[in-house]
Swiss-Prot record:
Protein name: Probable calcium-binding protein CML18
PANTHER family, sorted: EF-HAND CALCIUM-BINDING DOMAIN CONTAINING PROTEIN
UniProt key word GTP-binding: no
UniProt entry keywords in alphabetical sequence: Calcium, Metal-binding, Repeat
Species of provenance: Oryza sativa subsp. japonica
Sequence positions that bind Ca(2+) 4: D135, D137, D139, C141, E146
Source taxon at top rank: Eukaryota
Length: 158
């Protein structure tokens, strides 16, 4: 994911605009996405991202987490296959939040619904344009492989 897009997502999470995401802000966004988590699960997510252990996630920590954390950027190091499996599971969970009808594809309307819940003022037409930019197979939707490429910054753009 390009840094400009990561910054835009970060700003959605950073509700008070102080340049860092608190556990409360993370929990609020997850509730808006229809994925309310208990305090323990929110804390676990924060711990995964908060490499300097100050209790908040700043933009650099957020970017490192979403672009494949390394041990130098707060990652756990360890077995690459374990990290890849954990990353794949997290991506699948994120994909399911967007895929409201569980058909394995994210439509412009599904993307629009989630972005509106996050406070974005975009239109369905804007969402269609976003989807076209990553829709490698031309079906008008984003499947999991396209979503994975988009989230990993690995191409898929036309």
């Amino acid at each position: 994911m390009p840094m400009a897009e990561l910054e835009q997502v970060f700003r959605r999470y950073d509700a008070n605009g102080d340049g860092k995401i608190s556990a409360e802000e993370l929990a609020s966004v997850l509730r808006a996405l229809g994925a309310p988590l208990g305090p323990g699960e929110v804390r676990r997510m924060m711990d995964e991202m908060d490499s300097d252990r100050d209790g908040f996630v700043d933009l650099s920590e957020f970017a490192a987490f979403h672009c494949g954390p390394t041990p130098a950027h707060g990652g756990k190091g360890g077995d690459a296959k374990d990290q890849e499996a954990a990353s794949e599971a997290e991506l699948r969970e994120a994909f399911r939040m967007y895929d409201a009808d569980s058909n394995g594809k994210i439509s412009a309307r599904e993307l629009h619904r989630v972005l509106r819940q996050l406070g974005d003022k975009c239109s369905v037409a804007d969402c269609s344009r976003m989807i076209r930019s990553v829709d490698a197979d031309g079906d008008g939707c984003v499947n999991f492989d396209e979503f994975k490429k988009m989230m990993g910054g690995g191409g898929g753009r036309r």
